[in-house]
């Protein structure tokens, strides 16, 4: 990755979750303030880390989305949550969302939301 935040970078795109922009900004600021040496998008070995004399090492590898074993999952009309949130693939008008966890709800909210996010417009927020 070329920026910190991981899944927050997806979540901040969901209407009503724009506060994650601030979460990422806060952590960037704190890392800078504390002089934390952050290195992104690097492959390292144990020897690389040992030889640099760090006091502590945090390895944040991120996640790999789970792909369910469902017949047809590889069909061109099937869109994963990352592509849906990032707007990489068009989403039709009739959609089945598989999964009732937080990500399923976020994708549903994103693809059914019309107009400006209430979190960004006080007048819209007051009407919701």
Q: Residue spans of the language-model regions?
A:
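Rossmann-like dinucleotide/flavin-binding elements
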Residues: 1-4, 39-50, 61-74, 82-128
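Gly/Ser-rich helix-loop-strand patches that form or flank binding pockets
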Residues: 78
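N-terminal Rossmann-like dinucleotide/flavin-binding domain of flavoprotein oxidoreductases
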Residues: 6-54
């Amino acid at each position: 990755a070329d920026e910190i935040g991981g899944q927050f970078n997806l979540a901040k795109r969901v209407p009503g979750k724009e506060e994650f922009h601030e979460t990422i900004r806060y952590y960037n600021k704190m890392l800078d303030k504390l002089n934390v040496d952050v290195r992104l998008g690097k492959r390292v070995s144990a020897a690389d880390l040992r030889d640099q004399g760090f006091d502590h090492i945090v390895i944040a590898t991120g996640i790999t989305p789970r792909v369910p074993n469902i017949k047809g999952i590889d069909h061109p009309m099937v869109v994963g949550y990352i592509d849906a949130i990032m707007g990489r693939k068009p989403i039709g008008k009739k959609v089945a969302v598989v999964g009732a966890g937080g990500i399923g709800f976020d994708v549903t909210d994103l693809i059914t939301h019309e107009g400006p996010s209430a979190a960004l417009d006080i007048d819209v927020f007051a009407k919701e």
